[in-house]
Structures are given as structure tokens and as C-alpha cells.
């Protein structure tokens, strides 16, 4: 098409004549036409034949394209070993894409023994030729210290080279460096600018982080609608945390019309990827049965998945199910195990319920000191029932030294929150004190 009207059929005709004479450049170009169906009927088998003829004459671009065909099994039986062999031939001639793909093979052990140092060497060669993906991967190696001494400043330098070419992943990683001040002076506006560039190219992690900034209003004008829009874009690409966040937005009507169906959809997508918070929230929905038909068995299944990942709230709710035999066979020891796990993570309700069991000796050896310890942990978080029960322990001297002043203090804290039992207990003590004073001699 240089200085002459573009004519694909004519080009194919001329490439064919030249290819028959053994010209590797013509064989390569004709192969591309056959592979893509440009100016001639698509024929991948013919393309492979021509790539092979050209590659056998040492043409590095043909070696590379043929390697890709072997790697993907396009028009030829998949053969990673053969692909590596061809990438190597092409890479040795300095072809940047071949160097990069060969580095990927060495990095992951595809068709060849894993060798991170060799991968770094090849990323370096490709990166020096300006190949953005190689620059990015090399930057990751420097950031992590994989196959090369850790060097954050070098990583930033390489991320910058790649990002300046518009590579979305590099823009994102560079943004993270600017936001955290890693290997470069902290610069939040620059980070936001790079997150935006990356997000605009559809990179899900950038969309998610940018959404977080819009949601919280950190370093950017708060815009909940924009946040939801970006969460959704990220979620639709399978970002599990974005799926969870957009589900929360739909469930509560934050920045979007309340839509329980969509909330459940995104909770489910996130839960299926193992997000413990999504599993827990979805379990609550099935457990309560307010928004969908109640399904306690499904709830228990989801609580279990979440609890197994250490979610304290799920551990507590699952403990309740085992305690009551709700959706699962009653199992007090299992309930105690789950209460304990949840309580250790600071769940005040688990601390309280476990304290009750120790106080009463239900399913566990009675231990009033342990009960007081757990009531205290829960009460310190402001839980009124725990404050009331702890006050009772201080009043009676059960599991702790008797201390009426402390009891009054705790009853008062609970009563302020509207705890009726605490109000009655406080009144009882004060009435008793008042009565004692009346009986005292004047």
C-alpha cells in the first residue's frame, strides 16, 4: 500500500510467486494472509506449511509465529516443547516478542525447566528493545526480588517505561508505588491519574481501587455513583471484592437503586470465588428469609465456608446453628469450638455466649473465672448484656472478688443503653443501700 492502491489479492499473488522461489520473507507474509484470511481464503494448515518453510530458513518472525501456533495448538498439534525450541531460535536473533514469550516459558516452567534467572535475562533483552510487557514483568521481578536482587527503584523505573507506552498493568502497579511511596516519593494525585488511565483501559484492579477512592472521598472528590459504576465494571470482570462491594451497594441502595436480586447475584459471584464476607452475607440472607425463600441448610453451608476462612461473624452464627440444631445436627462441642474461635477474634456476642456456657457448665466444665474473663472482654466492647452479667458476678463475688462499686458502675453502663434487667438490678442495689442507711442508728 506504499505509493500504490492497496490490493490484497494482488499482494497475495506476488507473495505466492516469491514464496515459490523460496523467499522466506514472502513465505512469512503469505502465511499471515492464509492465517487471517486476508485476500485469500483462510487456511491455517497452509499458513503452518509456509511459516515452517520460512522458519527453516532462519526467519525470526516466522519462527516466532510458528512457535505461537505450536503453543496454542493452532493448525497443528499442541507442542509446548516445539514452541520453546522455536521461541529460542527467534529470541537468539533478537526478536523481542520471542524473548518475552520464552521468558514466560522459563518463568512458569512451560515446556522447559523453570529458571527465573533465565527469564529475567530474557525480559531484560526484550525490555531494552522497548517491549512494554517485558518491561512490566521485569519490574515485577525487581519489586519481588524474583531471579534478581530486590530493587524497588529499578522496578519503578521499569513500570514507568511500560506505563508510558500505555500498558494498563504497569500503570496500575506504578500507581500503587506512588500511592504508598514505594521506590518513589509519595504522590497521591499522580497515583489517581495512573489508576484512572489503567481503569479506562478496563483493568479491573485499577477500577476497583479507583472506586474505593471515589467511595471514601480519599484524595478525590467523593462520588458514590462513580464508585458504584467502577465497582460494577470491575465486578463484571470477576474481581471478587468488587463483586462484594457492589452487592452491598445494591442491597442497601447506596449510589444505586436498592435491588435485592442484583445484590444476591453479586454476593453469589463473590462467594463462589471464596470471599468470606460474601459467603457470610449470603448466608444471612438465606437464614433470615426476608429477601428470598428461607433456606437454613444453604445458610449453614455458606456459614461453614466463611467460618473455615476465619470469619468471626460466620463462626458465631454457625455456632448458634450447632447449639440449636438449626439446619444441622445439634452438636454442643462443635458450637463451643466455634464460639471459642470467634471469641478469640473479638466477636463480643461469641464472648458473651461462651461466658454463659462456662458460667453454667453447659457442654464445658464450669469455670466462673473464665466466664468473668469472657464477660469482661464482651463488656469492654460495650455489650449491655455482658455488662449486666459481669456486674452480677461482681455483686455476688462469683469468679471474681466481690465489688459492689464495680457492679454499680457496670449496671449503670448497661442501663444507659436501655437494658431493663440492669435498670432493675441497679434499682435493687440502690434500694438496698438506702434501706441499710435507714436502719443505721442516728
Q: Where are the regions a protein language model picked out?
A:
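TPR/TPR-like (Sel1-like) alpha-helical repeat modules
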Residues: 402-420, 427-430
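Short helix-capping/linker turns of helical repeat alpha-solenoids
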Residues: 1-2, 15, 21-23, 36-38, ...
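Alpha-helical repeat scaffolds
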Residues: 50, 86, 122, 194, ...
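Hydrophobic face of amphipathic alpha-helices that form TPR/SEL1-like repeat modules
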Residues: 29-36, 65-72, 101-108, 137-144, ...
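Terminal, low-structured helical/coil segments at or just beyond the last alpha-helical repeat
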Residues: 421-442
Amino acid at each position: 500500500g506504499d505509493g500504490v492502491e492497496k490490493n490484497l489479492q494482488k499482494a497475495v499473488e506476488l507473495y505466492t510467486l516469491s514464496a515459490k522461489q523460496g523467499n522466506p520473507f514472502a513465505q512469512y507474509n503469505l502465511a499471515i494472509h492464509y492465517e487471517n484470511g486476508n485476500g485469500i481464503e483462510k487456511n491455517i494448515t497452509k499458513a503452518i506449511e509456509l511459516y515452517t518453510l520460512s522458519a527453516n530458513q532462519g526467519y525470526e518472525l516466522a519462527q516466532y509465529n510458528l512457535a505461537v501456533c505450536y503453543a496454542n495448538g493452532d493448525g497443528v498439534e499442541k507442542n509446548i516443547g516445539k514452541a520453546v525450541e522455536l521461541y529460542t531460535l527467534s529470541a537468539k536473533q533478537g526478536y523481542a516478542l520471542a524473548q518475552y514469550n520464552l521468558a514466560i516459558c522459563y518463568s512458569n516452567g512451560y515446556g522447559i525447566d523453570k529458571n527465573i534467572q533465565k527469564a529475567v535475562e530474557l525480559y531484560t533483552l526484550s525490555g531494552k528493545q522497548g517491549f512494554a510487557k517485558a518491561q512490566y514483568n521485569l519490574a515485577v521481578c525487581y519489586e519481588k526480588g524474583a531471579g534478581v536482587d530486590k530493587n524497588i527503584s529499578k522496578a519503578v523505573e521499569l513500570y514507568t517505561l511500560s506505563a508510558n507506552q500505555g500498558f494498563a498493568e504497569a500503570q496500575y502497579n506504578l500507581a500503587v508505588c506512588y500511592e504508598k511511596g514505594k521506590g518513589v516519593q509519595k504522590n497521591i494525585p499522580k497515583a489517581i491519574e495512573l489508576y484512572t488511565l489503567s481503569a479506562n483501559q478496563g483493568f479491573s484492579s485499577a477500577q476497583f481501587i479507583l472506586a474505593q477512592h471515589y467511595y471514601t472521598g480519599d484524595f478525590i472528590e467523593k462520588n458514590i455513583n462513580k464508585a458504584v459504576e467502577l465497582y460494577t465494571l470491575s465486578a463484571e470482570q470477576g474481581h471478587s471484592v468488587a463483586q462484594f462491594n457492589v452487592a452491598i451497594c445494591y442491597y442497601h441502595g447506596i449510589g444505586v437503586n436498592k435491588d435485592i436480586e442484583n445484590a444476591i447475584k453479586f454476593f453469589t459471584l463473590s462467594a463462589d470465588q471464596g470471599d468470606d464476607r460474601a459467603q457470610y452475607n449470603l448466608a444471612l440472607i438465606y437464614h433470615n428469609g426476608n429477601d428470598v425463600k428461607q433456606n437454613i441448610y444453604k445458610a449453614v453451608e455458606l456459614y461453614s465456608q466463611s467460618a473455615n476462612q476465619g470469619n468471626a461473624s460466620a463462626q458465631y452464627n454457625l455456632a448458634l446453628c450447632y447449639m440449636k440444631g438449626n439446619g444441622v445436627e445439634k452438636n454442643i462441642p462443635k458450637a463451643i469450638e466455634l464460639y471459642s474461635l470467634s471469641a478469640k477474634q473479638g466477636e463480643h456476642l461469641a464472648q458473651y455466649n461462651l461466658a454463659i456456657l462456662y458460667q453454667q457448665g453447659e457442654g464445658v466444665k464450669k469455670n466462673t473465672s473464665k466466664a468473668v474473663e469472657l464477660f469482661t472482654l464482651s463488656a469492654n466492647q460495650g455489650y449491655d448484656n455482658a455488662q449486666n452479667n459481669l456486674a452480677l458476678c461482681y455483686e455476688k463475688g462469683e469468679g471474681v472478688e466481690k465489688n459492689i462499686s464495680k457492679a454499680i458502675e457496670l449496671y449503670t453502663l448497661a442501663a444507659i443503653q436501655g437494658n431493663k434487667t440492669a435498670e432493675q438490678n441497679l434499682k435493687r442495689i440502690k434500694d438496698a443501700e438506702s434501706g441499710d442507711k435507714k436502719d443505721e442508728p442516728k
